[in-house]
């Protein structure tokens, strides 16, 4: 296998200092059916200035303090904080990861996993509604904490029940910026278009996981180890229904925490 971090913008920690405490983060594998047999996954290319710059990754980011707000317990559909925390193996605050991954997905690629309170999946109905949600996305990217207010104003529930918990990775201690990341998987809504933000991400592709791994081996796509391993876990499925049924059937207590370790070689 090619070296995953080669060519990717990362910062190594001082080995003489205590390791950085990892920050909570959440990431989502957005998948869709192809016209022929198989599935595609959405990857974004991180901007050179960002952490993991140059690498193709899944949409996601840090869990913000606001993601733990009590008001989200009334906005999230199908998953309670107790259920989310139990799945993640933590005492409380688990729902914040589900909220964060929906928020980050909307911020980074413009896909909003939500339901209308009147019933049915959220998809913009016309150009006016599209423009309104582009404005919400821009405000979120500018740092405004408008997600809860947006859901209230637009009469939406966050579709937390459409996210399947997939994996748990912690950045190695050798790296300066570390994340305690929960990976989720969800089917992309048919009526929404995924578009990278042009700031933190500079390119995006829908690609079969098998093809993404092939292009990594050929040196055409830069990727980091968590991306590679999660891509491997979704290979070989005929459609998203089969894939999501398989991942939803996983007992969350069987999902191991993965924290790669690096060792210095003599010479």
Regions found by a protein language model. Give the residues of each.
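N-terminal leader/linker segments that precede catalytic domains of diphosphate-processing enzymes
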Residues: 1-267
């Amino acid at each position: 296998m090619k070296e995953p971090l080669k060519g990717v913008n990362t910062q190594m920690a001082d080995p003489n200092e205590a390791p950085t405490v990892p920050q909570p983060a959440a990431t989502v594998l957005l998948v869709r059916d192809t016209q022929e047999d198989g599935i595609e996954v959405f990857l974004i290319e991180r901007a050179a200035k960002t952490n993991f710059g140059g690498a193709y990754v899944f949409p996601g980011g840090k869990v913000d303090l606001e993601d733990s707000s009590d008001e989200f317990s009334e906005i999230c559909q199908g998953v309670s904080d107790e259920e989310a925390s139990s799945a993640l193996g933590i005492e409380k605050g688990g729902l914040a990861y589900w909220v964060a991954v929906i928020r980050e997905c909307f911020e980074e690629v413009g896909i909003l996993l939500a339901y209308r309170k009147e019933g049915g999946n959220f998809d913009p109905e016309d150009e006016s509604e599209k423009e309104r949600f582009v404005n919400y996305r821009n405000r979120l990217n500018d740092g405004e904490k408008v997600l809860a207010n947006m859901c209230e104003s637009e009469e939406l529930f966050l579709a937390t029940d459409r996210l399947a918990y997939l994996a748990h990775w912690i950045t190695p201690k050798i790296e300066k910026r570390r994340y305690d990341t929960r990976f989720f998987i969800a089917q992309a809504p048919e009526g929404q278009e995924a578009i990278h933000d042009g700031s933190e991400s500079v390119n995006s592709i829908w690609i079969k996981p098998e093809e993404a791994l092939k292009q990594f081996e050929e040196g055409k796509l830069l990727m980091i180890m968590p991306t590679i391993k999660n891509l491997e876990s979704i290979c070989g499925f005929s459609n998203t229904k089969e894939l999501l049924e398989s991942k939803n059937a996983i007992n969350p207590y069987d999902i191991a925490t993965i924290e790669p370790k690096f060792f210095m070689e003599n010479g």
